[in-house]
């Protein structure tokens, strides 16, 4: 029964359609289609129970574990272009209904879309006409995948389809139907005449202001793509016609165990995070502190001895200059005692 459940789950995952949203500048040309290479990562595997392992199991499971997951390559075709990214959920929900009770209805809509693609007898002609355009665009098109957090995703987009979000990062200039923007010097000259134009020709002044503002602002649109199963195109014949976009599958992948290292069973292991053995470090720190204290005490003693030696030297020098009687008076005034006091104390 477990095998049946796993196979049904895998089938549901494989049947999930692929939707790609491309964010691009308005001046960048629209791509009719492109190759999407999905690097699927291995699913997370539960922790092995070593008590249930055997030699036969290791021989059977060895090749499957070592098997690499091959990338999946599909051709996606343009479906719709919008100017607001907030409509993503509405677009996805319009394509795929989430209610299990309306599965038949949503399936019927999907079949209708297939029939519409089949009725398009000019699809091959359109692809042929756009070969040159796509070759030029594919040479300049560069894409980057946008990683977004799936936590708190109330729309449930990833439950309905494999959704990939990418952005065009190429610097392609508008080629088809491109407007001729004036140079910076011409814009400065026109700006100086705007006050006069507002009085004489208000409409021309408005058009010039709009052109100047549009040249400094960058507007974005969002193109939606999906896999068209009815497009019978071989990879060899169209690999140069359409660019390649490489993405990473955002489904659950093997990025380490969900549980942290603090939850491992062998809590007495030396490499366990909770297990800390600070005895050796503490002993080394105490020895360093003792050495520092000894060094400080020795320095204080040496300084005190140096001061006493200097004081005795100065006393002898003063005594030799003043004499014994005058030195006693000097010592009493300076040091607060006389030579007789020292003799009495001794």
Curated annotation (Swiss-Prot):
UniProt keyword Acetylation present: yes
Disruption phenotype annotation: Reduced DNA methylation at RdDM target loci and pleiotropic developmental phenotype.
Keyword Acetylation assigned: yes
One of the protein's GO biological processes: post-embryonic development
Positions bearing N-acetylmethionine: 1
Ranges in coiled-coil conformation: none
Region (Disordered): 253-346
Pfam families named among the record's database cross-references: Iwr1
Comp. bias (Acidic residues): 253-268, 278-312, 323-332
Similarity remark: Belongs to the IWR1/SLC7A6OS family.
Annotated function: Probable regulatory factor for several RNA polymerases. Effector involved in facilitation of Pol V transcription as RNA scaffold and recruitment of silencing complex to target genomic sites.
Protein name as annotated: RNA-directed DNA methylation 4
Lineage: Eukaryota, Viridiplantae, Streptophyta, Embryophyta, Tracheophyta
Gene this protein is translated from: RDM4
